[in-house]
Structure formats: C-alpha cells, structure tokens
Regions:
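Bacterial N-terminal signal peptides that target proteins for export
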Residues: 2-12
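Bacterial N-terminal signal peptides
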Residues: 11-21
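N-terminal secretory/targeting leader peptides
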Residues: 27-123, 138-349
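Basic, amphipathic alpha-helical recognition segments used for DNA target recognition
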Residues: 131
Length: 349
C-alpha cells in the first residue's frame, strides 16, 4: 500500500514538472514575423527599423519575437499591394506610403489628399490621430489592421527640369510623373499631362524626357539623385507623404499578453521620435542639395496657390469622394470638421 502511494506521489510530481515544462516552453517559444517595406533601405525610416527598432524589439522580448525585414525588390509585391498583403496576413507588418494605396482603399488617402490636409511641418501631426480614431476606425476594421507607428516623408512639391509654374498654363505640354489619381487630377488642373513611371525607372524617365518633372519630397529626390536632372524645386506644399507601419490584427492578437504590453509601451515611447525623424532629415537633405545638385527653390506664388486650393474641391476632392464610393463623403466631411475645429481653412466646402 505504501509503495502504491509512493508511486502516485512520484507520478503526480512528474506530471506537474512535465506540465510546467510545456507551459514554459510555450511561453518562451520564438515568434517570427515578416515585414515588407515599400522602401529600398535608404530612407530614414528603413534605417531606423533595421538598426534600432527591430533590435530593440528582440531585446525587450528577450529574443522571443524575431522580425524578418524585406525591402522592395526582396519581396514580390508592388507598393500598391502592401495594404492587401498585410490585411491577408501574407506579411505581419508593412511599411509603405498611404498615397500609393489609393487604388486599394482611397479612404485611407484622405490624410494625403492634395491641397486639403495641411502639409507644413507639424500641421498634419496635430490632427492625424484624431482622423484615424474618429473617422477611419471602421476602415481599419475592414482591412483587419491597425497603425503601430507613422513617419512623414515631408511636404510634396513639384520638381522641374528647366521651368517654373507661374500660372495655369505653365504645365501645358509638360509631362509630370505622379503616383496616384489625386495627383493626376492636380496636374490636369494645371493643364499638364500626368505620367506613371515605375519607381525604379524614374531617374531614367526624367533624364530622357519621358517626364519633364515629378511630384515628390526632398529626401526622396535627394537620395535617388533626381535633383541631378530636375533641379528646379517649385515649393508648392501639395500634401504630406504619410508613411505608416500597419500590423495585421491577428498577428498582434496572437502575441502573449506580456509581450503585447511591453511592445505597446515601446511603440508609444517612440511615436514622437519616429513621427518627426524623416521631417528633420528632409531639412538636412535640403541643405545638402544646394551644393550637391545646385538645387534652386522657387516658392509658388500665394495667389496662384490660393486659386488652386479654391478649385480643388471640384477638380480633386470631389472626384476622390466619388472614387471612394459609399462612405467617401462621410470621411471627407469628418476630416473637414476636424480641420476646421483645429483652426485650418477648408475652402470650397
């Protein structure tokens, strides 16, 4: 009888030890995420993820979370596909430019709608999370994603070969490289011809006259050497270029609670630094572009810009609302109300 009791005690102890080992093994198992980016590794944001954020994540999770970062060209997807890719769970994280997702989910591009949301440094940041939380909440739910961090690539301007925009006829006969329908409409408003060129071919297109100019930001033009062939910067402040990192909700929900809490605390602590980092880099790249490329800056006249904004509702914003379909007008009105509440003007609405 005593031997039987001893055996039961030993069996119980072994069972508890085995169960503890299984639980411990589960808690400590490595989780592997894949992150696709629209960048090629040269942008400020790409460098921060590779050199700072991913190592930090591995450190604060004690090596339990590993992230495999793939740049454009290392994964098979175009920039425009990344929202769909993260929504489906093909990637756990994506880093891209909202403006490139206009054909997939135009409502998200409200934050980069030309001549609508302010693009002077710091302006969009004032209203951005109100827009996400108050206006776009249902859009994120539809795509099964949420925002982790966002940086801003800086205000978008016209960069031109050997001319300036003086009036509504200055772009007649000129071809301007764009990357979404909203910018197409802006170029058409100025009587120019929008052309689409793959990102890898932009320099050649500018060099050979396939395009006479393009719309981009300072750092992108600087890093890709576009200013060698389009050295005239028409400071237009068309819109900002919002570059968020979205995560698949299932991937996030699959993390242990302690890991979720640690990561959320980390991302919250990095929000301001990450948000303004690229904007500050733009300033450094602008200064460097003067001696490096002999970049010339010509601010668009206030009167011309004001007239463009006044015509933007019919020429740019209304067509965007129509492309959005159901819910587009509600998103536009919701953001317009936030802008007016924050002291910004929304002409024509």
């Amino acid at each position: 009888m005593r031997n039987l009791w001893s055996r039961k005690v030993i069996l119980l102890i072994v069972s508890v030890m085995f169960f503890s080992m299984v639980v411990s093994s589960y808690a400590e198992k490595e989780i592997h995420w894949t992150m696709f980016t629209a960048g090629t590794g040269v942008s400020w944001a790409d460098k921060q993820w590779k050199n700072i954020i991913i190592p930090d994540i591995e450190r604060i999770t004690n090596g339990r979370l590993k992230i495999d970062l793939l740049y454009r060209g290392e994964h098979p997807y175009k920039d425009a596909d990344l929202l769909r890719v993260v929504s489906e769970g093909t990637a756990d994280l994506v880093s891209g430019w909202v403006a490139n997702w206009s054909g997939t989910e135009p409502r998200l591009t409200i934050v980069d709608l030309p001549m609508f949301v302010p693009s002077y440094p710091g302006d969009l940041q004032r209203v951005y999370h109100r827009i996400l939380d108050e206006v776009l909440k249902d859009v994120f739910a539809k795509w099964n994603v949420h925002e982790l961090l966002t940086t801003w690539m800086g205000a978008q301007h016209f960069y031109l070969s050997d001319f300036w925009i003086e009036d509504f006829n200055s772009l007649k006969g000129k071809k301007i490289r764009t990357f979404n329908p909203e910018l197409d409409d802006l170029v058409k408003l100025l009587n120019g011809t929008p052309v689409r060129v793959d990102a890898a071919e932009v320099y050649t297109a500018l060099q050979t006259g396939v395009a006479d100019g393009l719309i981009t930001g300072v750092s992108n033009g600087h890093d890709n050497m576009y200013f060698e062939v389009v050295p005239n910067m028409e400071a237009t402040f068309i819109c900002d270029c919002t570059a968020p990192v979205y995560i698949n909700n299932n991937s996030w929900d699959g993390l242990p609670e302690d890991m979720q809490n640690a990561l959320q605390k980390y991302f919250d602590s990095k929000r301001e630094w990450y948000g303004m980092g690229q904007t500050l880099q733009n300033g450094l790249d602008l200064i460097d572009s003067f001696p490096k490329f002999n970049l010339k800056v010509h601010p668009m006249s206030k009167d011309l810009r004001k007239e463009i904004v006044e015509k933007s509702y019919e020429a740019i914003w209304k067509p965007w609302i129509e492309r959005c379909g159901e819910g587009g007008e509600d998103v536009f009105k919701g953001v317009a109300d936030i802008l007016k509440n924050e002291g910004f003007e929304v002409p024509g609405f």
